[in-house]
Amino acid sequence: MTLTVTNYPFRDRWNDCLVRRAQYTGPSSYATGGEAIDNIDDFGWGETHTLVGTITDGTTQHHLYLNYATQRIMVFLAAGTQVTNGTNLSTFIGQIVATGK
């Protein structure tokens, strides 16, 4: 996964959870079911609890959804359907906010 994480030491808290803001770049070949989060390497925690964000290529916007059970970032079209398997999202970039422990 391509993430550029921004940390703000000692202020990155939401109740008892850590908060991270990151720039997310979509994969070159999206897999149905989403892109796996490597919690330790991507965010520095054991489990992601929430993730909010959108990605765009400058023309089209997609919504990001965290599948909590599988710890995967899923990408959805504005119509509410998941992006199809094999779709190139490498030109889609956006900001995400995630919480975890």
Indicate residue ranges for each PLM-predicted region.
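Extracellular receptor-binding modules and their adjoining Ser/Thr/Gly/Asp/Asn-rich linkers
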Residues: 1-35, 92-101
